[in-house]
Swiss-Prot record:
Name the record gives this protein: Small ribosomal subunit protein bS16
UniProt keywords, alphabetically: Ribonucleoprotein, Ribosomal protein
Organism: Sodalis glossinidius (strain morsitans)
Cellular component GO terms, alphabetical: cytoplasm; small ribosomal subunit
Coiled-coil annotated residue ranges, if any: none
Family: Belongs to the bacterial ribosomal protein bS16 family.
Length: 82
């Protein structure tokens, strides 16, 4: 099953997440189909905290992809801010 979820990157104690489309059987930070955004939970100042390609998200959801709880909350925040 295809899912849209977070893949962790960054350094120890400084997380940075890619929002990716992947097969649910793949490892959390493993192979993915497409990168559709990022989330920086510790963004400060002028740093961008969240970027999403909403068109691609709608495309993948239309193809039957499931969205993780955290990513769905981020999508909701992005739509509210736009």
């Amino acid at each position: 099953m295809v899912t849209i979820r977070l893949a962790r990157g960054g350094a120890k104690k400084r997380p940075f997440y890619q929002i990716v489309v992947t097969d649910s059987r793949n490892a959390r930070d493993g192979r993915f189909i497409e990168r559709i955004g990022f989330f920086n939970p510790i963004a400060t100042g002028q740093a961008e905290g969240l970027r999403l390609d909403l068109d691609r998200i709608e495309h993948w959801v239309g193809q039957g992809a499931t969205v993780s709880e955290r990513v769905s909350a981020l999508i909701k925040d992005a739509k509210k801010a736009a």
